[in-house]
Amino acid sequence: MRTGIIAQKIGMTSVFNDKGERISLTLVKVDDCQVVGHKTLEKHGYNALVVGVKDKKISRVTKPMRQVFANAKISPKTKLKEFRISEENFIDIAASLEVDHFTAGQFVDITATTIGKGFAGSMKRHNFRGLEASHGVSISHRSHGSTGQRQDPGKVFKGKKMAGHMGCNQVTIQNLKIFAVDKERKLIMIQGSIPGHKNSYLSVKDAIKKISITV
């Protein structure tokens, strides 16, 4: 099990293959991604790499984290993430991770944060049909309707689908195929869409439910 990398979503584009089929691609950029630290089985109970990306002002880093970056002999990073690995896949601290960590034709899992929608009603958030447009219904056309039962239990159960905050959730999309890798521009072209807004950060790692192939 190898480490993943932290990348930045650039946007979407499309290309045509040899059959004339249009393929939607998401472009992610891998820039200044470095190994910050190690987590070992003997000391922490599991094997993992701590990966960081994007330089950060030293004045905005806490004193404990300053020492972590000083020990690694690298500049402070804005984004940090742990990736579980097998024992034989450790990489030296301060080593850089580039786009050639992945190859075209390989399948990957993408973890990202969805776009926040704010407070949303039940029709938008849960795809409810709403109430009738007429026949005695007034004011409450887009309401969710009844949420409880009677005096017993006399409450609304946790997890009930209702209006509330929508989006801004961590989501993992599995088995997305890498269309191409552009080492010169530091870009990975991934087939399909990826959660998150433009310039948001996401993690890319080998797919765990599909055997990757190189085309």
Swiss-Prot record:
This is Large ribosomal subunit protein uL3. Residues 136-155 are annotated as: Disordered. It comes from Rickettsia africae (strain ESF-5). It comes from the Bacteria. PANTHER family: 50S RIBOSOMAL PROTEIN L3 (PTHR11229), LARGE RIBOSOMAL SUBUNIT PROTEIN UL3C (PTHR11229:SF16). One of the primary rRNA binding proteins, it binds directly near the 3'-end of the 23S rRNA, where it nucleates assembly of the 50S subunit. The modification N5-methylglutamine is found at residue 151. GO terms for cellular component: ribonucleoprotein complex; ribosome. One of its GO terms (biological process) is translation. InterPro entries: Ribosomal_uL3, Ribosomal_uL3_bac/org-type, Ribosomal_uL3_CS, Transl_B-barrel_sf. The keyword Ribosomal protein applies.
